[in-house]
Amino acid sequence: MPKPHQVQVIKDRETQLREQQEAESKRRTYRDVKEETRKKHKKAHFEASPTPEESTSDKISLPRKRYYRQRAHSNPFSDHRLEYPRSPDDMNWEKLFPGFYDEETKQMTSSVEIADVGCGYGGLLTKLAPEFPNSLILGMEIRVQVTQYVEDRIIALRNKHEDEDVNFQNIAVLRGNAMKFLPNFFRKGQLSKMFFCFPDPHFKQRKHKARIITNTLLSEYAYVLKEGGVVYTITDVEDLHNWMVKHLEEHPLFERLSKEWEEQDTCVSIMFNSTEEGQKVTRNKGSKWIACYRRLPNPEECV
């Protein structure tokens, strides 16, 4: 026969399990509703002005992060069953940036210039949007729930600000693995800026090959970056900062920008303060290490 304290432990476990099941049920219901909203609005062009009644009844609320639970990191070498184009020419950008699609010509009026690799919950995207209103900015995120959160966040922001100058039509997110498929999305020299904000440090030495900055990957980043384009990195892990600096310094197509340049660059300030991870580091009084590198001309072009 169980002792009284054992009975209490069993009850506590049952209560905890029941609460977890109830919480998961709420999350599932919430996400189902958001999924319907996402399907309805993610391809909307917002060309026809809604009636006052539609505007009032069809407002979309910002998503709540607690309903998008996800592990902090994801294994980039796993088979995530991701969708990706065979080449940049096969990519359908209209579904991500409907506001920049010309119905008459059936062509995009602009192409993606800025990429936030591992965009997390989209804090950097939303802050960059008003700074570069005519540039398309893409967030790439491998985690399912986090990607859906950012999708819902962008949909809500577009809905809320559709009649304003800053309407967030220039930002989007897709679920993708930049370590494997980056050249499938972007043409040679297409990007002007790439951000790597608080990437997974992969502390164990045997995991270092999974870090987002390696010699091989830097060559791919150099391929999609235009001459003079900038790689932005920030982390709260000094060892990872030193690792990224070492590999960028060793690569012949990147040159570090000065501290004076960093202090004057608007994107550095936004990157330092706007991401959710960065804000958490600030709250915990942690340190942030920044390094920015310019894409150099190819050697054969330096004649």
Curated annotation (Swiss-Prot):
One cellular component term from this protein's GO annotations in UniProt: tRNA (m7G46) methyltransferase complex
Major enzyme class: transferase
InterPro entries, alphabetized: SAM-dependent_MTases_sf, Trm8_euk, tRNA_(Gua-N-7)_MeTrfase_Trmb
Places the protein is found: Nucleus
Predominant location: nucleus
Comp. bias intervals (Basic and acidic residues): 10-38
GO molecular function: tRNA (guanine(46)-N7)-methyltransferase activity; tRNA binding
Amino acids binding S-adenosyl-L-methionine: 118, 141-142, 177-178, 197, 275-277
Function summary: Catalyzes the formation of N(7)-methylguanine at position 46 (m7G46) in tRNA.
Name listed for the protein in its UniProt record: tRNA (guanine-N(7)-)-methyltransferase
Gene this chain is encoded by: TRM8
